[in-house]
UniProtKB/Swiss-Prot annotation:
Source organism phylogeny: Bacteria, Pseudomonadati, Pseudomonadota, Alphaproteobacteria, Candidatus Pelagibacterales
Entry's Gene Ontology molecular function annotations: 16S rRNA (adenine(1518)-N(6)/adenine(1519)-N(6))-dimethyltransferase activity; RNA binding
Gene that this sequence comes from: rsmA
GO CC annotation: cytosol
Residue ranges crossing the lipid bilayer per the database entry: none
Name of the protein in question: Ribosomal RNA small subunit methyltransferase A
Domain of life: Bacteria
Stored InterPro entries: KsgA/Erm, rRNA_Ade_diMease-like_C, rRNA_Ade_Mease_Trfase_CS, rRNA_Ade_methylase_Trfase_N, rRNA_adenine_dimethylase, SAM-dependent_MTases_sf
Database matches in PANTHER family: DIMETHYLADENOSINE TRANSFERASE, DIMETHYLADENOSINE TRANSFERASE-RELATED
Length: 262
C-alpha cells in the first residue's frame, strides 16, 4: 500500500537513514515503553523497533497511514488513530514514556505548549525527542537578551531541560519542506518553580511578549494594579524590554500575581 504525503496535514516523511539512526541513539529505549507521534509511513518506527523497546505506541491522525502502519507492523506496535491534540498522553500507559515526534510544523508549538502546561507533579515521560521547524527550535532554546527569546523559551525552560541535537536539511525528507528542521531533546527538571495555575504563566508571558519592543512599564501596569511597586520589589528596571528578563524573573512575577489575587 502506498500513501502520498498530505500537505493539508503538514506531512513530510523523514527518509535519511543516517538521521533516523541518530534519532534512536539519543536515548536508551531498550526494554522501555515508547510513544511515537506522527509516524507517517513508519520509517522511524522501523528504527525504534530495532532498539527492542518493551512496547511501542504510535499516534497517527491520518486514517490511510494508520492502515498502512497496521499492514506493515501488525502486532509489533499499538496504533492510536487520533489527533495528538485530543489524546490524553497520561492515559496511554501507566509507565513513563520515551517520546519521539516528527511533529507537523503547523501545530508543533501548540502541542509543546499543551504538554508543558498540563504537566502535573509527576511527568508522564522521561524524555521527548522532537523535531521542529528550525526557526521555532531557535526560539525554544533561546536565552534571554536575544531577539529569538520569548514565550516558548520561557515555557520550555520552566520544567524542562532543553538541548539541540542537530539541524536537518530539507533533502532528508520526502516531500522536501522549504525550510530547515531541528531536533531537540527535552528532559524533566528535578526542581522547578511551583505555580498554582500554569495558565497564568501562559497569560502573563503572552501579555509581555505581545509588546516585545515596548518598555516594561506598559505590560507591568496591565498585569498588576501596582506595577511600579512590583517592579521595585524585584529590582526590575521598567526601561528594559521583555526579552531582557530571564525566565526565573517571569516565574517569580507569576507567583506574585497569584499571591496578590489570593
Amino acid at each position: 500500500m502506498f500513501v502520498k504525503a498530505k500537505k493539508s496535514l503538514g506531512q513530510n516523511f523523514l527518509i535519511d537513514r543516517e538521521v533516523l539512526e541518530k534519532i534512536v541513539s539519543i536515548t536508551d529505549i531498550t526494554n522501555k515503553e515508547v510513544l511515537e507521534i506522527g509516524p507517517g509511513s513508519g520509517n522511524l518506527t522501523t528504527y525504534i523497533l530495532k532498539k527492542k523497546p518493551k512496547k511501542l505506541y504510535v499516534v497517527e491522525k491520518d486514517d490511510d497511514l494508520a492502515i498502512l502502519l497496521k499492514e506493515k507492523f501488525d502486532t509489533e506496535i499499538k496504533i492510536i488513530n487520533d489527533d495528538i491534540l485530543k489524546v490524553s498522553e497520561s492515559t496511554i500507559s501507566d509507565q513513563k514514556l520515551s517520546v519521539f515526534g516528527n511533529l507537523p510544523y503547523n501545530i508543533s508549538t501548540e502541542i509543546l505548549s499543551k504538554w508543558i502546561l498540563n504537566i502535573g507533579s509527576n511527568f508522564w515521560f522521561d524524555s521527548l525527542v522532537l523535531m521542529f521547524q528550525k526557526e521555532v527550535a531557535d526560539r525554544i532554546i533561546s536565552e534571554f537578551n536575544n531577539s529569538n527569546y520569548g514565550r516558548l523559551s520561557i515555557l520550555s525552560s520552566w520544567k524542562l531541560n532543553v538541548k539541540k541535537i542537530l539541524d536537518i536539511k530539507p533533502q532528508s525528507f520526502s516531500p522536501r519542506p522549504k525550510i530547515d528542521s531541528s531536533l531537540l531533546l527535552f528532559t524533566p527538571k528535578e526542581n522547578f518553580f511551583k505555580l498554582k495555575d500554569p495558565k497564568n504563566l501562559e497569560k502573563i508571558t503572552r501579555i509581555f511578549f505581545s509588546q516585545r519592543r515596548k518598555m516594561l512599564k506598559k505590560p507591568f501596569n496591565q498585569v498588576f494594579d501596582n506595577g511600579k511597586e512590583v517592579a521595585e520589589k524585584f529590582g526590575i528596571d521598567l526601561n528594559l524590554r521583555p526579552q531582557n528578563l530571564e525566565p526565573d524573573v517571569y516565574f517569580k512575577l507569576v507567583k506574585e500575581y497569584e499571591d496578590l489575587r489570593g
